[in-house]
From Swiss-Prot:
<dbReference type="GO" id="GO:0000786">
    <property type="term" value="C:nucleosome"/>
</dbReference>
<keyword id="KW-0539">Nucleus</keyword>
<feature type="region of interest" description="Disordered">
    <location>
        <begin position="1"/>
        <end position="90"/>
    </location>
</feature>
<keyword id="KW-0158">Chromosome</keyword>
<keyword id="KW-0238">DNA-binding</keyword>
<dbReference type="GO" id="GO:0030527">
    <property type="term" value="F:structural constituent of chromatin"/>
</dbReference>
<protein>
    <recommendedName>
        <fullName>Histone H1.M6.2</fullName>
    </recommendedName>
</protein>
<dbReference type="GO" id="GO:0006334">
    <property type="term" value="P:nucleosome assembly"/>
</dbReference>
<dbReference type="InterPro" id="IPR005819">
    <property type="entry name" value="H1/H5"/>
</dbReference>
<dbReference type="GO" id="GO:0003677">
    <property type="term" value="F:DNA binding"/>
</dbReference>
<dbReference type="GO" id="GO:0005634">
    <property type="term" value="C:nucleus"/>
</dbReference>
<feature type="compositionally biased region" description="Basic residues">
    <location>
        <begin position="11"/>
        <end position="90"/>
    </location>
</feature>
Length: 90
């Protein structure tokens, strides 16, 4: 019983804190959608900041990937247009 008795003592303050925090957050979101939207925008801003600092290499890699993606759809579209035009001419 000693093993079973120890974890509840450790877990109870965490569970109590989680129970206290979650109803407040849920009530705030239900009461004010503007505040919830403000939290989302703040989260987006914080997420963007590290992305701006880090990816010099990612910025270089992105332009290389985009032209390849741009060329492929153009190659796919061109034969389709030619097939459509041919019956019209006939």
């Amino acid at each position: 019983m000693s093993d079973a008795a120890v974890p509840p003592k450790k877990a109870s303050p965490k569970k109590a804190a989680a129970k206290k925090a979650s109803p407040k957050k849920a009530a705030a979101k239900k009461a004010s959608p503007k505040k919830a939207a403000a939290r989302k925008t703040a989260a987006k801003k914080t997420a963007k900041k590290p992305a701006v600092r880090k990816p010099a290499a990612k910025k270089r890699a992105a332009p290389k990937k985009k032209p390849a993606a741009a060329k492929k759809p153009a190659a796919k579209k061109a034969p389709k247009k030619a097939v459509k035009k041919a019956p019209k001419k006939k």
